[in-house]
Amino acid sequence: MQKGDTLKKGDILAHCGNSGRSPQPHIHFQLQATPFIGSKTLDYPLGHYILNTDKGYELKSFEKPEKDDKVTAVEKNQTLYKAFHFIPGQQFEFEAALPGGQKKTYKWEVVADIYNNTYIWCEATHSKLFFKSDDDMMYFTHFEGKRRSLLFYFYLTAYKVLYGYYKDMELKDSFPVNTLNSGLLILLQDFVAPFFMFLKTNYQLKYISKKDDFTDSSIEMQSQVDIRVGGISMKKYNFTLSVRKDHIAEFTVTHKNKIVVATNINKPLS
């Protein structure tokens, strides 16, 4: 990189070196609003980065690293990226093994509307699962349709997925309170919302294992949804999520000793 060059995202700015006065290589950088020497430094957060601690890896989003933090950019795993980088026109077909031995087939399609909102459409249940994505992750924004549908379970399973694989790393987030709550509880929460939130629906996804070889690649993940009222866990959903050969191969839903197994019976069609 030379003075005056135009930069784009992903360009290498510098290599980490040693000035001779430091015991280890390091790099200094700052953000400023104007290109002039001596301009004020902006106190600005970084989008997504990985914090490496003694306990393992931790995703940080829109935060600022602390002194002595060991950080790295998110290293994209192509298997995860291709599986969760949904493209309009892409189609999926899942066979769901339901409690009681029944089996049903569901066809989904990725759609973009005239406002460029992207969502997964289920023809059988007339349900929509809206999503957004950036260079580092895919995340669902909201669901419209039947809450007992396979698409809704997929919403709960893969609410937020980072494209990078870091073993045992956990992603944590929360759903809107009306996702799995209704009736009097929602009315009461709306009334006291300015003071405190006693309803919480927590989401957690954990990266379990990864296998790579010349002909195949696979990644296993587990996720959980925990509905809490006043700090007490009232209901839990447990999920597994399997990625094979760059596509979502299978996901399972366990709730109240009932298990739903959804198997992708064809690779995504473009």
Language-model region placement:
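Active-site proximal loops enriched in glycine and acidic residues that flank catalytic Cys/His/Asp
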Residues: 17-20, 31-33
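Preference for solvent-exposed, low-hydrophobicity sequence contexts
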Residues: 150-247, 254-269
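Short linear proline/tyrosine/threonine-rich motifs used for host-factor recruitment
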Residues: 120, 250-253
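Short, well-structured beta-strand-loop connectors
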Residues: 2-15
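Short glycine/proline-centered loop/turn elements that form peptide/ligand docking sites
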Residues: 2, 18-25
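A short, sequence-level motif marking secondary-structure junctions
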Residues: 5, 134-138, 266-269
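Acidic, glycine-rich catalytic/binding loops that coordinate metals and/or anionic ligands
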Residues: 30-160
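A generic structural signal for beta-strand entry/edge sites
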Residues: 24-26, 117, 248
